[in-house]
């Protein structure tokens, strides 16, 4: 909310006993007033000039991983579909949309996963990743956002499914909290059908 945290959110943070808060995004995303709503807590902000730089900083913050997952930063659905895979692999998700957004240190990752079709993460990006990783690059995609999430689920082979509206990011983003222990698919569905 541009006006700051809602009262319920502040109350929940206190009830959870949180002592450290990380704000993700710049002042246009999360206003400075949020910090004043959280007195006595360690609050820090991770942000960049755009969503891609913020994503890159979060990947760095994530720490070491043997894997990395790439998704299109212009569309939320593929990033949401990638979340159960990233959880299983204990890997960060990096938002990309052009070659200049790729990390320079691709070689540190054992393998890379691209979630989404060639219209989401282009062949130029895939080829650049392959030039470093060789055959350790895997693309998972479907004809649309719902089938992409289904293809990720096919790879994971989990028995438990979380269904969320694939047309609106809010429900699916909230559902990511249910992935805390892994072992669940996040399936995006159309509003009027499964």
Which role does the model predict for each range below?
Residues 1-194:
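Extracellular glycan-binding segments that recognize GlcNAc-based cell-wall polysaccharides
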């Amino acid at each position: 909310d541009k006006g700051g945290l809602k009262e319920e959110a502040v109350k929940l943070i206190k009830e959870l006993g949180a002592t450290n808060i990380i704000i993700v995004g710049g002042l246009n995303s999360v206003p400075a007033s949020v910090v004043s709503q959280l007195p006595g807590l360690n609050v820090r902000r991770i942000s960049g000039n755009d969503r891609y730089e913020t994503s890159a900083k979060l990947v760095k913050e994530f720490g070491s991983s043997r894997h990395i997952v790439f998704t299109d930063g212009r569309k939320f659905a593929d990033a949401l579909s990638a979340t159960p895979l990233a959880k299983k692999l204990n890997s960060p998700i990096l938002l990309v949309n052009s070659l200049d957004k790729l990390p320079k240190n691709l070689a540190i990752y054992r393998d890379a996963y691209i979630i989404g079709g060639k219209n989401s993460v282009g062949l130029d990006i895939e080829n650049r990743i392959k030039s470093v990783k060789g055959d350790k690059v895997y693309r998972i995609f479907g004809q649309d956002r719902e089938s992409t999430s289904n293809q990720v689920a096919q790879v994971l082979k989990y028995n438990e499914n979380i269904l969320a509206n694939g047309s609106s990011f809010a429900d699916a983003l909230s559902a990511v909290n249910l992935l805390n222990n892994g072992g669940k698919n996040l399936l995006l569905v159309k509003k009027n059908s499964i």
